[in-house]
Amino acid sequence: MQKATHSITPEGFPVIGLTALAALVFAIIDCWFMAVVFLLLCWFSVHFFRDPERVVPSAPGAGVSPADGRIIKVQPMPDPFTGEPRMCVCIFMNVFNVHVNRFPVSGTVQSIAYHPGKYFNASWDKASTDNERCAYDIVDADGLRWSMVQIAGLIARRIVCRVEEGDTLRRGERCGMIRFGSRVDVYLPEEYEPKVTVGETVFAGQTVLAAKKEQPAE
Protein backbone atom coordinates (compact mmCIF):
# COMPACT_ATOMS: atom_id res chain seq x y z
CA MET A 1 0.00 0.00 0.00
CA GLN A 2 1.50 3.33 -1.10
CA LYS A 3 1.23 6.45 1.02
CA ALA A 4 1.79 9.94 -0.32
CA THR A 5 4.04 12.12 1.82
CA HIS A 6 4.53 15.05 -0.55
CA SER A 7 2.51 18.12 -1.46
CA ILE A 8 2.53 16.70 -5.01
CA THR A 9 1.12 13.22 -5.56
CA PRO A 10 3.74 10.75 -6.90
CA GLU A 11 1.82 10.23 -10.15
CA GLY A 12 2.46 13.87 -10.99
CA PHE A 13 6.26 13.89 -10.94
CA PRO A 14 6.79 12.36 -14.43
CA VAL A 15 4.31 14.77 -16.06
CA ILE A 16 5.72 17.80 -14.25
CA GLY A 17 9.30 16.77 -15.04
CA LEU A 18 8.64 16.23 -18.75
CA THR A 19 6.77 19.51 -19.24
CA ALA A 20 9.45 21.43 -17.32
CA LEU A 21 12.20 19.79 -19.39
CA ALA A 22 10.38 20.58 -22.64
CA ALA A 23 9.99 24.22 -21.57
CA LEU A 24 13.72 24.41 -20.81
CA VAL A 25 14.73 22.84 -24.15
CA PHE A 26 12.53 25.21 -26.16
CA ALA A 27 13.88 28.18 -24.19
CA ILE A 28 17.47 27.14 -24.95
CA ILE A 29 16.77 27.02 -28.70
CA ASP A 30 14.94 30.39 -28.51
CA CYS A 31 11.54 28.93 -29.38
CA TRP A 32 9.80 31.08 -26.81
CA PHE A 33 6.23 30.41 -27.85
CA MET A 34 6.59 26.67 -27.23
CA ALA A 35 8.61 27.34 -24.09
CA VAL A 36 5.72 29.38 -22.69
CA VAL A 37 3.20 26.71 -23.75
CA PHE A 38 5.08 23.97 -21.89
CA LEU A 39 5.69 26.25 -18.92
CA LEU A 40 1.94 26.77 -18.66
CA LEU A 41 1.40 23.01 -18.98
CA CYS A 42 3.92 22.49 -16.20
CA TRP A 43 2.09 24.99 -13.99
CA PHE A 44 -1.23 23.26 -14.72
CA SER A 45 0.30 19.87 -13.89
CA VAL A 46 1.62 21.14 -10.55
CA HIS A 47 -1.84 22.52 -9.78
CA PHE A 48 -3.62 19.35 -10.88
CA PHE A 49 -1.40 16.89 -8.99
CA ARG A 50 -1.32 18.87 -5.75
CA ASP A 51 -1.95 16.77 -2.66
CA PRO A 52 -2.76 18.99 0.35
CA GLU A 53 -3.06 17.65 3.87
CA ARG A 54 -6.58 17.52 5.28
CA VAL A 55 -7.97 17.68 8.82
CA VAL A 56 -10.08 14.54 9.20
CA PRO A 57 -13.16 14.98 11.44
CA SER A 58 -12.93 13.23 14.80
CA ALA A 59 -16.67 12.58 15.06
CA PRO A 60 -17.19 8.85 15.70
CA GLY A 61 -19.20 6.96 13.13
CA ALA A 62 -19.00 9.66 10.46
CA GLY A 63 -18.20 8.93 6.82
CA VAL A 64 -16.19 11.57 4.96
CA SER A 65 -16.12 12.58 1.33
CA PRO A 66 -13.65 10.51 -0.72
CA ALA A 67 -13.14 13.33 -3.23
CA ASP A 68 -13.07 17.07 -3.75
CA GLY A 69 -15.88 18.33 -5.92
CA ARG A 70 -19.59 19.00 -6.15
CA ILE A 71 -22.45 16.73 -5.10
CA ILE A 72 -24.49 15.86 -8.21
CA LYS A 73 -26.72 13.08 -6.83
CA VAL A 74 -28.05 11.84 -3.52
CA GLN A 75 -30.42 8.98 -4.27
CA PRO A 76 -30.86 5.18 -4.09
CA MET A 77 -28.89 3.32 -6.75
CA PRO A 78 -28.01 -0.37 -7.34
CA ASP A 79 -24.96 -1.37 -5.32
CA PRO A 80 -22.07 -2.36 -7.65
CA PHE A 81 -21.41 -5.59 -5.74
CA THR A 82 -24.86 -6.82 -4.68
CA GLY A 83 -27.17 -5.03 -7.11
CA GLU A 84 -29.45 -4.10 -4.21
CA PRO A 85 -30.63 -0.47 -3.96
CA ARG A 86 -28.61 1.60 -1.49
CA MET A 87 -28.39 5.31 -0.81
CA CYS A 88 -25.65 6.69 -3.02
CA VAL A 89 -23.82 10.02 -2.92
CA CYS A 90 -22.12 11.05 -6.18
CA ILE A 91 -19.27 13.59 -6.28
CA PHE A 92 -18.21 15.18 -9.58
CA MET A 93 -14.63 16.46 -9.88
CA ASN A 94 -13.67 18.99 -12.53
CA VAL A 95 -10.10 19.51 -13.76
CA PHE A 96 -9.48 22.24 -11.18
CA ASN A 97 -10.29 20.11 -8.13
CA VAL A 98 -7.75 18.13 -6.11
CA HIS A 99 -7.95 14.63 -7.59
CA VAL A 100 -6.44 12.55 -4.79
CA ASN A 101 -9.11 10.20 -3.41
CA ARG A 102 -9.41 9.22 0.25
CA PHE A 103 -11.09 6.45 2.23
CA PRO A 104 -14.58 7.45 3.42
CA VAL A 105 -14.38 5.32 6.60
CA SER A 106 -11.89 3.30 8.60
CA GLY A 107 -12.18 -0.26 7.39
CA THR A 108 -10.84 -3.18 5.39
CA VAL A 109 -10.99 -3.62 1.62
CA GLN A 110 -12.83 -6.89 1.06
CA SER A 111 -12.67 -6.82 -2.73
CA ILE A 112 -11.76 -4.57 -5.66
CA ALA A 113 -13.50 -4.84 -9.03
CA TYR A 114 -12.09 -3.05 -12.08
CA HIS A 115 -14.35 -2.63 -15.11
CA PRO A 116 -12.97 -1.33 -18.43
CA GLY A 117 -15.52 0.81 -20.20
CA LYS A 118 -16.33 3.97 -22.08
CA TYR A 119 -15.68 7.62 -21.30
CA PHE A 120 -19.02 9.38 -21.20
CA ASN A 121 -19.36 12.62 -19.28
CA ALA A 122 -18.99 11.56 -15.63
CA SER A 123 -22.06 13.57 -14.61
CA TRP A 124 -24.36 11.46 -16.84
CA ASP A 125 -26.47 8.69 -15.29
CA LYS A 126 -25.02 5.96 -17.52
CA ALA A 127 -21.48 6.78 -16.36
CA SER A 128 -22.13 4.62 -13.27
CA THR A 129 -22.63 1.49 -15.38
CA ASP A 130 -20.92 2.16 -18.73
CA ASN A 131 -17.72 4.08 -17.96
CA GLU A 132 -14.34 2.71 -16.92
CA ARG A 133 -14.51 2.34 -13.15
CA CYS A 134 -12.96 0.73 -10.10
CA ALA A 135 -15.22 -0.39 -7.24
CA TYR A 136 -14.16 -1.06 -3.64
CA ASP A 137 -16.13 -3.21 -1.19
CA ILE A 138 -15.28 -1.92 2.31
CA VAL A 139 -16.22 -3.31 5.73
CA ASP A 140 -15.95 -0.86 8.63
CA ALA A 141 -15.19 -1.56 12.30
CA ASP A 142 -18.88 -2.26 12.98
CA GLY A 143 -19.07 -4.85 10.22
CA LEU A 144 -21.10 -2.53 7.96
CA ARG A 145 -20.47 -2.60 4.22
CA TRP A 146 -19.66 0.48 2.18
CA SER A 147 -19.00 0.65 -1.54
CA MET A 148 -16.87 3.30 -3.24
CA VAL A 149 -16.53 3.61 -7.01
CA GLN A 150 -13.96 5.67 -8.93
CA ILE A 151 -15.41 6.52 -12.36
CA ALA A 152 -13.36 7.82 -15.29
CA GLY A 153 -14.94 10.67 -17.24
CA LEU A 154 -14.85 12.41 -20.59
CA ILE A 155 -11.28 13.66 -20.14
CA ALA A 156 -10.05 11.31 -17.41
CA ARG A 157 -8.40 8.23 -18.91
CA ARG A 158 -6.66 6.58 -16.00
CA ILE A 159 -7.83 5.41 -12.60
CA VAL A 160 -5.07 5.01 -10.01
CA CYS A 161 -5.68 2.48 -7.22
CA ARG A 162 -3.12 2.47 -4.39
CA VAL A 163 -4.70 -0.25 -2.25
CA GLU A 164 -5.09 -4.01 -2.46
CA GLU A 165 -7.67 -6.46 -1.22
CA GLY A 166 -7.15 -7.06 2.49
CA ASP A 167 -5.66 -3.62 3.17
CA THR A 168 -6.96 -1.78 6.22
CA LEU A 169 -7.09 2.01 5.98
CA ARG A 170 -8.09 4.85 8.25
CA ARG A 171 -10.84 7.31 7.49
CA GLY A 172 -9.42 10.07 5.28
CA GLU A 173 -6.34 8.08 4.25
CA ARG A 174 -5.24 8.39 0.63
CA CYS A 175 -6.25 5.47 -1.57
CA GLY A 176 -5.82 6.62 -5.19
CA MET A 177 -6.77 9.23 -7.75
CA ILE A 178 -8.33 9.75 -11.18
CA ARG A 179 -6.54 11.89 -13.73
CA PHE A 180 -8.13 14.94 -15.30
CA GLY A 181 -11.77 15.15 -14.28
CA SER A 182 -13.93 12.35 -12.97
CA ARG A 183 -16.43 11.17 -10.37
CA VAL A 184 -16.58 9.12 -7.17
CA ASP A 185 -19.74 7.40 -5.87
CA VAL A 186 -20.21 6.25 -2.27
CA TYR A 187 -22.89 3.69 -1.36
CA LEU A 188 -23.94 3.95 2.28
CA PRO A 189 -24.92 1.18 4.70
CA GLU A 190 -28.60 1.12 5.63
CA GLU A 191 -27.68 2.37 9.10
CA TYR A 192 -26.29 5.65 7.68
CA GLU A 193 -27.90 8.71 6.15
CA PRO A 194 -26.38 11.40 3.91
CA LYS A 195 -25.41 14.75 5.42
CA VAL A 196 -24.88 16.58 2.12
CA THR A 197 -27.22 17.91 -0.56
CA VAL A 198 -27.05 18.26 -4.34
CA GLY A 199 -24.96 21.26 -5.38
CA GLU A 200 -22.88 21.31 -2.20
CA THR A 201 -19.08 21.59 -2.45
CA VAL A 202 -17.14 18.91 -0.55
CA PHE A 203 -13.50 18.21 0.29
CA ALA A 204 -11.85 14.79 0.42
CA GLY A 205 -11.16 13.48 3.90
CA GLN A 206 -12.64 16.59 5.49
CA THR A 207 -16.34 17.06 4.69
CA VAL A 208 -18.72 14.78 6.61
CA LEU A 209 -20.65 12.91 3.92
CA ALA A 210 -22.80 10.62 6.06
CA ALA A 211 -23.58 9.81 9.70
CA LYS A 212 -25.36 7.06 11.59
CA LYS A 213 -29.11 7.43 11.76
CA GLU A 214 -30.46 8.48 15.12
CA GLN A 215 -32.23 5.68 16.92
CA PRO A 216 -35.83 6.48 17.89
CA ALA A 217 -36.40 6.97 21.60
CA GLU A 218 -38.10 4.05 23.30
Curated annotation (Swiss-Prot):
Single GO cellular component term: plasma membrane
Domain of life: Bacteria
Cofactor remark: Binds 1 pyruvoyl group covalently per subunit.
Cofactor(s) listed in the protein's UniProt record: pyruvate
Pfam family, one: PS_Dcarbxylase
Pathway participation: Phospholipid metabolism; phosphatidylethanolamine biosynthesis; phosphatidylethanolamine from CDP-diacylglycerol: step 2/2
Active-site residues from the entry: 182 (schiff-base intermediate with substrate)
Membrane topology: Peripheral membrane protein
Free-text function comment from the UniProt entry: Catalyzes the formation of phosphatidylethanolamine (PtdEtn) from phosphatidylserine (PtdSer).
Family of this protein: Belongs to the phosphatidylserine decarboxylase family. PSD-A subfamily.
Annotated protein name in UniProt: Phosphatidylserine decarboxylase proenzyme
